[in-house]
């Protein structure tokens, strides 16, 4: 709108186009990889990261309670938008520090047997599955991926699922337990440690004995697969818990 501020992702390959489209407006850029008005440096920690944010108002270190490099970039976007709207740096820091994630989106929960559950069951596409696998791969202990089908990805669904299986193996995951027609291709390409199941009950029967204090578990799948059935079944506090952050 006239007099508004355009908040632009400097890491976006089309950021130059966005700048051109907003010529004459005030702009505020953010980024992790490129120089920006709001620039971040992320230091991964267990189940989160420390994000150092340099802004026109100064520098602040924020302990994010959500994992993943993509969430660090999301935090920078939120910081830039808030600063553009007139928020103070202290308010931005407080807001980011207090954010504990959203149910089913890389939500950290305690699982039975003392295992760590990364509940990312709300939805899935190839990019978000890779991002979630990266989070699991950086988590200590044995690593198990429970993968449901990815939906609405067109005629290349088979290829995309196959590639996810290979990516999971390349990232050092120990087990891939698959549910759904296309996810069977992921389990096959994963190789040793990959298994496909016809039902949630069969999958749970194989999964539960694998859970222990040295285990990290990621549950991921598209909305229509209802993978929260798996996440809630293995969560120590069941479906009604808010998770552990």
Regions inferred by a protein language model and the residue ranges of each:
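Flexible active-site lid/hinge loop adjacent to a nucleotide/diphosphate
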Residues: 1-21, 65, 151-152, 156
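ATP-dependent carboxylate-amine ligase
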Residues: 23-26, 36, 47, 56-61, ...
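A short, compositionally biased
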Residues: 43-50
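Short beta-strand elements of ligand-binding domains
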Residues: 29-33
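A generic structural motif
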Residues: 52-54
């Amino acid at each position: 709108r006239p007099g508004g501020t355009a908040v632009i992702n400097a890491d976006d390959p089309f950021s130059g186009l966005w700048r051109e489209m907003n010529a004459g407006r005030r702009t505020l850029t953010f980024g992790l990889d490129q120089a920006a008005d709001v620039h971040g440096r992320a230091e991964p920690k267990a189940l989160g990261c420390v994000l150092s944010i340099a802004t026109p108002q100064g520098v602040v270190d924020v302990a994010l309670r959500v994992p993943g490099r993509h969430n660090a970039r999301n935090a920078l976007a939120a910081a830039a938008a808030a600063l553009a709207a007139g928020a103070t740096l202290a308010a931005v820091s407080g807001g980011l520090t207090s954010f504990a994630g959203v149910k089913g989106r890389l939500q950290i929960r305690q699982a039975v047997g003392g295992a760590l559950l990364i509940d990312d069951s709300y939805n899935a596409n190839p990019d978000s599955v890779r991002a979630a696998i990266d989070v699991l791969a950086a988590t200590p202990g044995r690593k198990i991926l429970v993968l449901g089908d990815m939906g609405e990805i067109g005629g290349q669904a088979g290829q995309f699922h196959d590639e996810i299986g290979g990516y999971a193996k390349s990232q050092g995951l120990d087990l891939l337990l698959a549910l759904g027609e296309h996810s069977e291709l992921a389990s096959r390409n994963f190789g040793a440690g990959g298994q496909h199941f016809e039902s949630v009950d069969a999958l749970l029967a194989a999964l539960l004995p694998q859970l222990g204090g040295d285990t990290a578990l990621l549950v991921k799948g598209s909305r229509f697969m209802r993978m929260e059935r798996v996440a809630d079944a293995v969560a120590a506090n069941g479906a009604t818990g808010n998770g552990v952050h």
